UniProtKB/Swiss-Prot annotation:
Classification of source organism: Bacteria, Pseudomonadati, Campylobacterota, Epsilonproteobacteria, Campylobacterales
GO biological process, alphabetically ordered: intracellular iron ion homeostasis
Family affiliation: Belongs to the Dps family.
Name of the protein: DNA protection during starvation protein
Organism, scientific name: Helicobacter pylori (strain ATCC 700392 / 26695)
Reactions the enzyme catalyzes: 2 Fe(2+) + H2O2 + 2 H(+) = 2 Fe(3+) + 2 H2O
Outcome following mutation: residue 70 to T: In strain: 1811a and YS2
Disulfide-linked positions: none
Positions contributing to Fe cation 1 binding: 25, 52, 56
Length: 144
């Protein structure tokens, strides 16, 4: 797979995760509602930024980003969540798994971009990896 193709898959993943985390944000139940509501808002905002950054990088590489949800659904590898009631521990476990998946995908992006001599995408991917690894560490500590 080429760099721009991985970017498109990640763009699809980002928009699906944006919606998935909104579902958690709106439908969390329990005594820690306020904390989880705030935390999930921060997370879905990160996915919105990621979606836009990925699209802009795709354009910079001379390709067209995803512009429809139907395209995103075809390309995503993220499992959508259709339930509408959640407890915080389940939410954070699911987000942790999604972060681990993204970590793997951004490593692939970094390696592929490196092989193609695309230093800008390598830097972007490595920056995302640093953020994801910190988030993974924090969620693992929270769930311990």
């Amino acid at each position: 797979m080429k760099t721009f193709e991985i970017l498109k898959h990640l763009q699809a993943d980002a928009i699906v995760l944006f919606m998935k985390v909104h579902n958690f944000h709106w439908n969390v139940k329990g005594t820690d509602f306020f904390n989880v509501h705030k935390a999930t808002e921060e997370i879905y905002e990160e996915f919105a930024d990621m979606f836009d950054d990925l699209a802009e990088r795709i354009v910079q590489l001379g390709h067209h980003p995803l512009v429809t949800l139907s395209e995103a659904i075809k390309l995503t590898r993220v499992k959508e969540e259709t339930k509408t009631s959640f407890h915080s521990k389940d939410i954070f476990k699911e987000i942790l798994e999604d972060y681990k998946y993204l970590e793997k995908e951004f490593k692939e992006l970094s390696n592929t971009a490196e092989k193609e001599g695309d230093k800008v995408t390598v830097t972007y991917a490595d920056d995302q990896l640093a953020k994801l690894q910190k988030s993974i560490w924090m969620l693992q500590a929270h769930l311990a």
